[in-house]
């Protein structure tokens, strides 16, 4: 399913309506806000065609993670007794909503032009169904021996319980779609009648399929695979970190653009995955390594499940398994060599002790001299440890700006706790200049996508690229609390990777949730160089116009060697005279406030980098 289609389906839940003109207007508004330019007539026509053609069926799955503020309170493997006491009441409210959330996941259907009737039908079936005897909260709290249900177990029990309603829903859906085919207005043109009938026929057939055991089992199996995939991801720390950054940014985005239907309760996230493709991939490979990695890619990179994404995943997993096998063999070899070295060293020490014993018999030493020497050595060692401890107390502020050490500290040794070191590429520093100078450099540069941009476009791009103050955070000891590193890849003979954090960009009273992207590569001197730095709004990623996922491998930046001779370590960096920005550091946020240079009391915009979600 295309990224446009996913966005349209997302909007159905937000708008609580399905009039096509209203959806187009909402898409237009969000697209223009995200990309900071007006859509052309051709672009609007593409949107219209996409919305008119798409019919959203059997694509939704529930992601078994629950956030409360900046805390992750439920993971796939969380049991009720594992939940922090202060969060249990909130968690139980979320779990109580599972029946309606699961029902929405199973039956959410987007009908181009008018979905009101399907939404009304969905609500009617749910409200007239008795849930007597099924209480997900009681189920979750129940323990058998010392072990209770995991959150994914409760989710799946709820799915299986709700599947019983699908027969009634499917029958009514097919009946009403059939009736609407007979009622198609004669005032429509032949082409419009054809489109309307085709769409309703698809829905009628889908309703009939929902009554079949095969379709019901497919829905259950798809959600079960997602739950298992999320558990697989959760148990791999390197994957968990990236997954949580993406999930947390989606959670924050949903809070800024949607009004909660359940008051102060934040429901679990949903994603759009083709059920049939997911199930068939699992049936083909029977490997959670492959399916778990595939779902991770789909979730992080916004990809569809198709032959290309499946093949890429299979190759990636096999390469990783081979690398892990080679690494394991190398570690075993090193352990064997180390054991042999230790054995030889022990043998040499024993022989040395024997030779010392023989020497003492021939020549006696001065009484107590050995004890004095040992004491002196111990005092010297303690003195060195105190000196090293003092060295480690270099302040974060000094390290962030590359400042000199305090005079009281030794200048002969380097602090072990010094922050991260990064050089900054010319293409990043370019954005600190005026829009006119940036345009001149881009027009003469080798990057085709940046040529011939208007001054207005450059000024808008400058807002999200001129965030060089983020380097202060990147170089600090706190960087790992805000950013995760992605997998590394090779391009043009250089090793590249990204660091990604969650950010909120504010301007003119509007907030945009997104990610702070940092692109890095390893230079010939084995140093880390920042060649890409920007804030990317979630709406920009959803719009998909030339936008790449923050977690996707690869990029379109070439010719890094062009600016390699003009790298900077950003020590003591200052903006040109007259430009003002202020850094505000808090416990869980790093905020950059940009002010009007002519009137510093006026805030133009701000960027807040948020600490990673806390896992309870």
Swiss-Prot record:
Residues 384-396 have a biased composition (Acidic residues). InterPro entries: DUF3654 (IPR022115), UPF0329 (IPR011667). Residues 319-340, 347-356, 374-383 have a biased composition (Basic and acidic residues). Residues 357-366, 410-422 have a biased composition (Basic residues). Residues 319-422 are annotated as: Disordered. Belongs to the UPF0329 family. This is UPF0329 protein ECU10_1810. It comes from Encephalitozoon cuniculi (strain GB-M1).
